[in-house]
């Protein structure tokens, strides 16, 4: 059986005249206007629901019109381009809201050109899962990065085997720690889990245990690079699975995501 390979065109300024094909993202309905409406809309754009809604719209459109239809391909590239543009703004203008990044006027989202405007760095915000897909489709395998401080890691020393084993062994004193461990980001962060999933980390620090059993760990965590692909997985979550279905429809190249930087962890407890 012959396999059909579909290449989605990258977002560019050469768009057809049907209104650019951008879907409208809809926050939960709030009667009337005023501060409450603004709060709801801004909160929606900061939430994973914004990313999931966009992916659902894309999947629904493809089901109705087919993955190889030229109009479908342009609509896919246009909507992904809006997210690339927003993520770019989040990187270039730290501290702005996702809503403002998505609606930034200069350049207008409809003028986003992946070939000239794509960035190595990703923001780590709710826009990033779709941007990670864009790099798979059009990035030609070039490595990307997201700062480890921006991916919302939650690390407990008691979930790190070497630290847990020392604490439970009954010893007392101060112990240097240097160990690698696997961490499932999708267990608590649907956005990070969608494009990183399980990652390999390394912690270095000092564990101090007192005679009464109280302990304190003070250290840093760094990450090894992660490969972005669509291999079989059980830890991607609802957004990650939607990305997997979309990625399977089109040709792309897997690539490395670098996670530069470090985060500090300090926790105390009693065995």
Swiss-Prot record:
Highest taxon of source: Bacteria
Motif (TonB box): 2-9
Pfam families assigned: Colicin_M
A GO BP entry: defense response to bacterium
Keywords noted in UniProt: Antibiotic, Antimicrobial, Bacteriocin, Plasmid, TonB box
InterPro entries, per the entry: Colicin_M
Note: This colicin requires TonB for its uptake.
Described purpose of this protein according to its UniProt entry: Colicins are polypeptide toxins produced by and active against E.coli and closely related bacteria. This is a calcium-requiring inhibitor for murein biosynthesis; it causes lysis of sensitive cells accompanied by murein degradation. The target site is possibly the cytoplasmic membrane.
Name recorded for this polypeptide: Colicin-M
């Amino acid at each position: 059986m012959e396999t059909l390979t579909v290449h989605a065109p990258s977002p560019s300024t050469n768009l057809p005249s049907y209104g650019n094909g951008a879907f409208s993202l809809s926050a939960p309905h709030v009667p009337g206007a005023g501060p409450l409406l603004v709060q709801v809309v801004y909160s929606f754009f900061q939430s994973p629901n914004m990313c999931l809604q966009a992916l659902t719209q894309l999947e629904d459109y493809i089901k109705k019109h087919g993955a190889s239809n030229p109009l479908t391909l342009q609509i896919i590239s246009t909507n992904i381009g809006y997210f690339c543009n927003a993520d770019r703004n989040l990187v270039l203008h730290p501290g702005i809201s996702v809503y403002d990044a998505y609606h930034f006027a200069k350049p207008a989202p409809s003028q986003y050109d992946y070939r000239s405007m794509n960035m190595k760095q990703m923001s780590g915000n709710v826009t990033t899962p779709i941007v990670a897909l864009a790099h798979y489709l059009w990035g030609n395998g070039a490595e990307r990065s997201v700062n480890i401080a921006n991916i919302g890691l939650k690390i407990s020393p008691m979930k790190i085997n070497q630290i847990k084993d020392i604490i439970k062994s009954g010893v007392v004193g101060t112990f240097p720690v240097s160990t690698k461990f696997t961490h499932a980001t999708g267990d608590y962060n649907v956005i990070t889990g969608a494009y990183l999933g399980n990652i390999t980390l390394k912690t270095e620090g000092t564990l101090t245990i007192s005679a009464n059993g109280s302990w304190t760990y003070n250290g840093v965590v760094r990450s090894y690079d992660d490969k972005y692909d669509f291999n079989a997985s059980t830890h991607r979550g609802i957004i990650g699975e939607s990305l997997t279905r979309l990625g399977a429809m089109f040709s792309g190249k897997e690539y490395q995501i670098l996670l530069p930087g470090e985060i500090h962890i300090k926790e105390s407890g009693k065995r």
